[in-house]
């Protein structure tokens, strides 16, 4: 159905336009004025709200049908007879019970004398593209006026009125049009349309032929079979100056001044109060991160365009499909009476998995399906307190020798066998970095662990990262076992460590607490068995470590990196279920099929049960460290989950990056001047190290004049795309334990891109901080060189006034900047030592305690007792 204007529908429904406008506002539709168009669904609602009035009963059902009235007599000559129209008597109203003439009268003979009998059945005329509904039936919608230039605007269906039949005028018989082709339906043409009823038309009877739309000899067709007759006014057609007769479309009624004023008011620009939106009463609306106004409108059942206008009045320039930040959504919700709640990422992910009938984080089956599993132990502590050495002693390996700088750069997961009185038992160890830059990695390690082993050096005691690791373990609500390491070193004091940790709530068992302290030496192996026993005792006493191995595997990706030959490789920890080769797996935004699994020694593994760390090959991309992984029934489901997660994260980032910029911000930037920006591209061997490096670099603060911007980061070797991006954005590439490819190296040398390589994280931080300080404008400070007191003034025609001085402190240097101070007041500033002499000899400097002659160039206002201070501006190093 085509669009209809409000005033047209009002005429059709026989109501006023303002009544329809009020109803539209009740329905929540924003309509400016009566000339606005409305959509088909809205028209349907209005028709239901304003049903047509009941129609009067008609005899034999014929009065309700508009019959094809005979047209006025037309002259075939060039002259018309307006006098006959003027002399026509008034029309006589025919009773409704009168039978239509078209049903009983046969057509007379045509010009050739051939008689064609009118059959009693109607002949169906060819239908135009959009047929109009019959008048007796409730109209479903007015047809749109065509593009025919010979037709006048169609009249709107009105309640049936008694048929007016004008009296015939003698002497003016209608001259019929010759037929196009006997027996063939005529094509609807402008001249063949049903004529407009007019006064002065003769009633059909003897001697008056019946004018048919398709030509002579055709029976009258029902009006619903063709287009409503609105034919153009032909020659000799009766009517007024514009062909309006009694049956023509009524002219537009004259509007009062009040009505015109109301229409003018409706044409004004809409304001926020004029937008009809469903108002809330404090209802809670839950929206995901990065939701758009269309999502909000769908929740409250409103038009997105209306929300765009409301947001515009609130000072937000957004579109209906643009991701909006949390503050804007809450502001808009408060304006409309709703409480907007942004769904957390955890709830979003849970709802996403529930849509696929996947439940994350629970064991399936009853108690009988649960079996014991090994404890997962995370080793945490301050940097260089011997965590990796301790694990080496437990595993009898040498992992620390392979770490750059002796500092663990990423998480390592291992499973070891501990010999106990009840037999061998498995323990899974997770080694987390202790450097301050790896805070996020320590937090992840605490979240996936069962027991935290806090390593504290007996000689150093409690350090900053020790406290941070302790807080992570407490936040994860896991039991803590303290390993006091390096007890073999001179100056070791385990008792001091116990006393320090008491301040943080860890009271040793020997002091009446519930925390187990074990003195160990990773170097000599002392206390290793006691530490393993303490871990198992804590697990048996405080934890119920059971899981169901007979379900699809679920767990967490501890670490991931990109291998040149094997592709993305992720170190995962299975928490429940069993992971097998060939399973479809999804971890965060990465998905794939498990092609192979390797243990910590590089040996292939066919399946991994609960608490087992393995390396998984087969992901399509590198998952982020800390992403949960799960096995799904098929690859299609894994792909859909990953794509939806990626789209959700992209919308959240778009919403976060959209920042409101005010005039105050612009003025502030103008006052500060151009901000220097150091652009970086980070590439690393594992995703956790790249994340830690980025977090550490972004924490560098050298003031408001310079800042760091990481434009790209990734895992794997430095590629040509990274170099081209650095060229386009004038960035520096930092490779952490990675090197560039052959062509990438050549391209970087050719384009002059600065590529830095690091294997220890704090070296990268120091270099970037130095580079960032180099972007700052230099800061100078004044350094005083010396002072000289004027004892005598000598006047020279060649050099001007010469001050005979005694150097009181420092050194007076020729060419240095100077100022003249008289009685504590500076009388001359920014002058220079133009000449410096000692006993008629030109010298470059005069030290303290010696006399000299000083010339200050053009400044000659020198008096006895003045003090000449020399100084220089030196660049101040950035702290």
Curated annotation (Swiss-Prot):
Residues 82-111, 198-213 have a biased composition (Low complexity). Residues 406-410 are annotated as: G2. Residues 381-388 are annotated as: G1. Residues 485-488 are annotated as: G4. Residues 48-261 are annotated as: Disordered. The keyword Magnesium does not apply. Residues 251-260 have a biased composition (Basic residues). GTP binds at residues 381-388, 431-435, 485-488. Keywords: Cytoplasm, GTP-binding, Initiation factor, Nucleotide-binding, Protein biosynthesis. Pfam families: EF-G_D2, GTP_EFTU, IF-2, IF2_N. One of its GO terms (molecular function) is GTPase activity. Its main location: cytoplasm. Residues 228-246 have a biased composition (Gly residues). HAMAP family: IF_2_B. One of the essential components for the initiation of protein synthesis. Protects formylmethionyl-tRNA from spontaneous hydrolysis and promotes its binding to the 30S ribosomal subunits. Also involved in the hydrolysis of GTP during the formation of the 70S ribosomal complex. Belongs to the TRAFAC class translation factor GTPase superfamily. Classic translation factor GTPase family. IF-2 subfamily. PANTHER family: TR-TYPE G DOMAIN-CONTAINING PROTEIN, TRANSLATION INITIATION FACTOR IF-2-RELATED. This is Translation initiation factor IF-2. The lineage of its organism: Bacteria, Bacillati, Actinomycetota, Actinomycetes, Acidothermales.
């Amino acid at each position: 159905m085509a669009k209809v204007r409000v005033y047209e529908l009002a005429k059709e429904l026989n109501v006023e336009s303002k009544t329809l406008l009020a109803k539209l506002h009740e329905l929540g539709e924003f309509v400016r004025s009566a000339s606005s168009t409305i959509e088909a669904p809205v028209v349907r609602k209005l028709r239901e709200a304003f049903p047509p009035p009941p129609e009067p009963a008609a005899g034999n059902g014929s009065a309700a049908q508009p019959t094809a009235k005979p047209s006025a007599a037309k002259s075939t000559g060039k002259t018309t007879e307006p006098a006959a129209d003027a002399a026509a008597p008034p029309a006589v109203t025919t009773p409704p019970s009168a039978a239509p003439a078209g049903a009983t009268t046969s057509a007379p003979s045509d010009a050739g004398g051939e008689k064609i009998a009118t059959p009693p059945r109607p002949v169906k005329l060819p239908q135009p593209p959009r047929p109009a509904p019959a008048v007796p039936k409730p109209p479903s919608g007015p047809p749109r006026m065509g593009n025919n230039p010979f037709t006048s605007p169609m009249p709107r269906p009105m309640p049936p009125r008694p048929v007016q039949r004008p009296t015939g005028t003698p002497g003016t018989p209608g001259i019929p049009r010759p037929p196009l082709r006997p027996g063939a339906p005529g094509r609807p043409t402008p001249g063949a349309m049903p004529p407009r009823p007019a006064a002065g038309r003769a009633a059909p009877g003897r001697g008056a032929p019946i004018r048919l739309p398709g030509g002579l000899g055709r029976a009258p067709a029902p009006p619903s079979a063709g287009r409503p007759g609105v034919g153009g006014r032909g020659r000799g057609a009766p009517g007024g100056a514009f062909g309006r007769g009694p049956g023509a479309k009524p002219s537009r009624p004259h509007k009062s001044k009040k009505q015109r004023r109301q229409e003018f008011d409706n044409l004004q620009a809409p304001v926020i109060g004029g937008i009809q939106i469903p108002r809330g009463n404090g209802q809670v609306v839950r929206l995901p991160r990065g939701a758009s106004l269309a999502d909000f409108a769908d929740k409250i059942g409103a038009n997105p365009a209306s929300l765009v206008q409301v947001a515009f009045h609130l000072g937000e320039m957004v579109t209906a499909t643009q991701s909006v930040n949390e503050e804007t959504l809450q502001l808009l919700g408060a304006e409309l009476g709703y409480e907007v709640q942004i769904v957390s990422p955890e709830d979003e992910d849970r709802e996403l998995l529930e849509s696929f009938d996947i439940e994350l984080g629970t064991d399936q089956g009853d108690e009988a399906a649960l079996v014991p599993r090994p404890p997962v132990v995370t080793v945490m502590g301050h940097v260089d307190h011997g965590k990796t050495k301790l694990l080496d002693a437990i595993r009898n390996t040498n992992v620390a020798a392979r770490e750059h700088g002796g500092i663990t750069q990423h998480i390592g997961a291992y499973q070891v066998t501990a010999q106990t009185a009840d037999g061998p038992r498995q323990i899974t160890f997770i080694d987390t970095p202790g450097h301050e830059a790896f805070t996020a990695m320590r937090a992840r390690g605490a979240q996936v662990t069962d027991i935290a082993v806090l390593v504290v050096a007996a000689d150093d005691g409690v350090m900053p990262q020790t406290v941070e690791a302790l807080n992570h373990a407490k936040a994860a609500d896991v039991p803590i076992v303290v390993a006091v390491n390096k007890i073999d070193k001179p100056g070791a004091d385990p008792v001091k460590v116990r006393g320090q940790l008491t301040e943080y709530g860890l009271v040793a068992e020997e002091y009446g607490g519930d925390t187990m302290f074990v003195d160990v030496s990773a170097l000599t192996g002392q206390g290793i068995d006691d530490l393993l026993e303490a871990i198992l005792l804590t697990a048996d006493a405080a934890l119920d470590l059971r899981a169901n191995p007979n379900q699809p595997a679920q767990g967490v990706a501890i670490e991931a990196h990109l291998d040149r030959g094997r592709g993305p490789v992720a170190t995962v920890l299975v928490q429940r279920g069993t992971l097998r080769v060939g399973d479809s797996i999804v971890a965060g935004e990465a998905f794939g099929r498990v092609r192979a699994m390797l243990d910590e020694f590089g040996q292939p593994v066919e399946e991994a049960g609960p608490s087992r760390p393995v390396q998984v090959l087969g992901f399509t991309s590198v998952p982020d460290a800390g992403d949960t992984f799960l096995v799904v029934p098929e690859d299609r489901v894994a792909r859909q989950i990953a794509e939806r997660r990626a789209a959700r994260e992209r919308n959240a980032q778009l919403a976060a990056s959209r920042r409101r910029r005010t005039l105050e911000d612009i003025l502030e930037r103008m006052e500060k001047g151009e901000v220097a920006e150091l652009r970086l591209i980070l590439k690393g061997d594992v995703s956790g190290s790249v994340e830690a490096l980025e977090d550490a670099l972004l924490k560098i603060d050298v003031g408001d004049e310079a800042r760091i911007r990481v434009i790209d980061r990734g895992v794997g070797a430095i590629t040509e795309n990274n170099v081209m991006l650095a060229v386009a954005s004038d960035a520096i590439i930092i490779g952490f334990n990675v090197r560039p490819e052959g062509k990438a190296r050549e391209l970087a040398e050719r384009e002059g891109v600065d590529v830095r390589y690091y294997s220890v994280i704090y070296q990268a931080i120091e270099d970037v901080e130095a580079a960032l300080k180099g972007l700052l404008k230099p800061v100078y400070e004044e350094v005083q060189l010396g002072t000289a007191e004027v004892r005598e003034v000598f006047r020279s025609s060649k050099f001007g006034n010469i001050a005979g001085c005694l150097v009181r402190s420092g050194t007076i240097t020729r060419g240095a900047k100077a100022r003249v101070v008289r009685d504590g007041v500076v009388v001359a500033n920014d002058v220079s030592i133009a000449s410096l002499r000692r006993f008629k000899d030109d010298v470059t400097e005069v030290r303290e305690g010696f006399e000299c002659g000083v010339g200050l160039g053009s400044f000659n206002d020198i008096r006895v007792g003045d003090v000449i201070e020399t100084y220089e501006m030196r660049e101040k190093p950035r702290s």
